[in-house]
Amino acid sequence: MKTLSILVMAGGTGGHVFPALAVAEELRARGALVEWLGTAKGIENTLVPKANIPLNLISVEGVRGRGLTGLLKAPFLITKAVFQAISIIRKMNADLVLGFGGFASGPGGVAARLLGKPLVIHEQNAVAGTTNRLLARIAQRVLAAFDGAFHNTSTRVVKVVGNPVRPSIYQLPPVAERYQARAQEHPHLLVLGGSLGAKAINELLPMALAQLNEGQRPEVWHQTGKAHGESTAALYLQQQVNARVEPFIEDMAAAYAWADLVICRAGALTVSELMAAGVASALIPLPTAIDDHQTRNAHILASANAGVALVQQTLTAADLAALLSTTLADRPALMAMAQRAQHLAHPNAAATVANVCVEVAHG
């Protein structure tokens, strides 16, 4: 059987790139030749070379929010990017193009269509982004992490496959074993400000925890993001709250295994990791996220009683303190929430996406 050549398109943020990397590794494990299409400004420039995957760059940026000048320039920039993508697809003689959203996926998907190459797309969020909504009309197969992502979009049948996440998170001990082993300890609170940091979360948590009696306070492990480590540590000190504060947590599997409750944003990858790990959560969606997709992501967990969704615009330190006081005191409820989250997981997401790619490529 001919060795498959597959171009993976993903870029901009970790939410696009990490799931794509998981599928790329699965495809390579099956013997496929994989190359990557991205842009010069995205996180893929660091992550993809580390994975020893050839990285091809095209010149394209987002159009939304760029103003009139950006809209006028867009057709010329997109046309240029499409021709760059055509050249890359021809050079590697791709059998299939696989898109995960982000700026590079649009021109790459159009190039695939113009060259008659099969296109498969995957949407990570609970509401499809602009690029994937457009590409869904020309793709051979449309995959989504969550049901309803392409609601009100004229598209083919959507297959719900989940989000690929790192295997180490699926290899944690069972939920009941983890939660029961800590039954006599103070609860463990993991706070994730995200790799870039969520200022609202970083500022709110120290103030909320300060309102709890010392005997009620959990053990705290707080990831602040690179720019907010010192300022957040200073806030905890000012509020006289003990916390382990780190700009970045390298081993997220260990962090999830440690946690009884996670407070975090509701990015697609984070929500999928909470499901995979089986851990209770209180989600504070980013209010400025495009199409308010984080609120929709949070709703996936909240609607199944597998997490709590909060609203940043109205959330106060007193509100959060009350939630923590009630939630952390009820370990059986935390464990049940964690188990419900894990029931929503898709442990074989990367393999499922790879299966679809192989099936479509072989026609």
Curated annotation (Swiss-Prot):
Pfam family, one: Glyco_transf_28
Gene Ontology CC terms: plasma membrane
Residues bound to UDP-N-acetyl-alpha-D-glucosamine: 13-15, 125, 166, 195, 249, 268-273, 294
Record Gene3D superfamilies: Glycogen Phosphorylase B
Any one Gene Ontology BP term: cell wall organization
Keywords: Cell cycle, Cell division, Cell inner membrane, Cell membrane, Cell shape, Cell wall biogenesis/degradation, Glycosyltransferase, Membrane, Peptidoglycan synthesis, Transferase
Pathway in which the depicted protein is active: Cell wall biogenesis; peptidoglycan biosynthesis
Compartments where found: Cell inner membrane
Domain of life: Bacteria
Membrane topology term: Peripheral membrane protein
Keyword Amino-acid biosynthesis: no
Chief site of localization: membrane
Catalysed conversion reaction: di-trans,octa-cis-undecaprenyl diphospho-N-acetyl-alpha-D-muramoyl-L-alanyl-D-glutamyl-meso-2,6-diaminopimeloyl-D-alanyl-D-alanine + UDP-N-acetyl-alpha-D-glucosamine = di-trans,octa-cis-undecaprenyl diphospho-[N-acetyl-alpha-D-glucosaminyl-(1->4)]-N-acetyl-alpha-D-muramoyl-L-alanyl-D-glutamyl-meso-2,6-diaminopimeloyl-D-alanyl-D-alanine + UDP + H(+)
Residues forming coiled coils: none
EC top class named in words: transferase
EC numbers: 2.4.1.227
GO molecular function list: UDP-N-acetyl-D-glucosamine:N-acetylmuramoyl-L-alanyl-D-glutamyl-meso-2,6-diaminopimelyl-D-alanyl-D-alanine-diphosphoundecaprenol 4-beta-N-acetylglucosaminlytransferase activity; undecaprenyldiphospho-muramoylpentapeptide beta-N-acetylglucosaminyltransferase activity
UniProt xrefs under NCBIfam families: murG
Function description: Cell wall formation. Catalyzes the transfer of a GlcNAc subunit on undecaprenyl-pyrophosphoryl-MurNAc-pentapeptide (lipid intermediate I) to form undecaprenyl-pyrophosphoryl-MurNAc-(pentapeptide)GlcNAc (lipid intermediate II).
Family membership noted in the UniProt record: Belongs to the glycosyltransferase 28 family. MurG subfamily.
Protein name listed in UniProt: UDP-N-acetylglucosamine--N-acetylmuramyl-(pentapeptide) pyrophosphoryl-undecaprenol N-acetylglucosamine transferase
